Amino acid sequence: MRIAILGSGVIGTTYAYAFQKAGHETYHILREEKIAAAPAKITVHLLDGRCNPKGEEKDDEYRVSLAEAGDTFDFIIISVAGGKLSDAIKTIKSRDIKGPLILFCNFWNERKQVEEILGDSEYVTAFPTAGGHIQDGKLNCVLFDHIMLESGSKARISDYAALVSLLNSADIKQEIPHDMFEWIWIHMAINAGVTSTAAREGVIDDPNRLARELMGDSKALTIAVRAIRETVKVVEARGADLRLYKNELLPYRIPAGIAGIAMKKLFAGNELTSRIMTLHNDVNDIMYGCKCVYDEGKKRGLELPLFYGNMERIFTNLDGRKLV
């Protein structure tokens, strides 16, 4: 298949690498001003969890090809920072590039709002289980064995089976939640609870260090569980039935102290999970989700004292810096 990736970010490039290794053609859609600086190849260091649950370290290269104006693709992957979906669609349309869209995005939007941005484009909402960073032409990333994927009945694409075939060809399984939008909101709420706890002293400039300290501290993880219990109330207030997401929320329903100890053991014994926690260092992207949850909770008049207190210390120390 011919797969396009908007931009050259970590998530899109990680999955592009996996698809290219599976025999598919991959192309990057870049803005005109970035085309000249695009590399011909990227060095890849991957902790690959697709075949080995503990992960397998791999070193390889990824060949970079560029999409041209007017091209048509089997699928186009869009993975952009929160709030930037509209600009992403404008970039694709300005190049007259066509194909069904795979949305690998954090967004706090309602489905109707996203569809207003997309217009008549075919699309499916999904969520990656990968992460990392690109620096000096080297991609250092983690790839799990599955993605979260909207069900065929809710996806707005004409060939859902082709998408499943693409994913299977790259050994990427699919987990299908009740509703992909609500699942993303829950994911953002959980992350907001974790982030607000890790940075509860008010400093968030070094996410890598904060993640390492949090994962090794069962008492801090206990606080995180309590914060998550607050933040998921925001998703419930938006109309989501949390009973439909028992698997996602079960770890936060057991006694917080026990959950904190269990989470510390999980991080210590699972390199895939612990490494992905430390590789995400984009403060603006991290804070986007936190701010969405905070603002929604305030708007709805919810009592979330632990979460609000942590976030307000962070906001104070950010001292008006631009977040998104």
Locate the predicted segments by residue.
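Hydrophobic anchor at the start of a short beta-strand
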Residues: 3, 25-27, 101, 123, ...
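Active-site-proximal catalytic alpha-helix in oxidoreductases
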Residues: 181-211, 219-232
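Rossmann-fold dinucleotide-binding core
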Residues: 110-189
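NAD(P)-dependent Rossmann-like dehydrogenase/reductase catalytic/cofactor-binding core
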Residues: 225-324
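Helix-loop-beta segment of a Rossmann-like dinucleotide-binding subdomain
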Residues: 138-148, 201-213, 269-280
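NAD(P)+-binding Rossmann beta1-loop-alpha1 motif at the extreme N-terminus of oxidoreductases
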Residues: 1-55
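Rossmann-like NAD(P)(H) cofactor-binding subdomain of soluble oxidoreductases
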Residues: 55-139
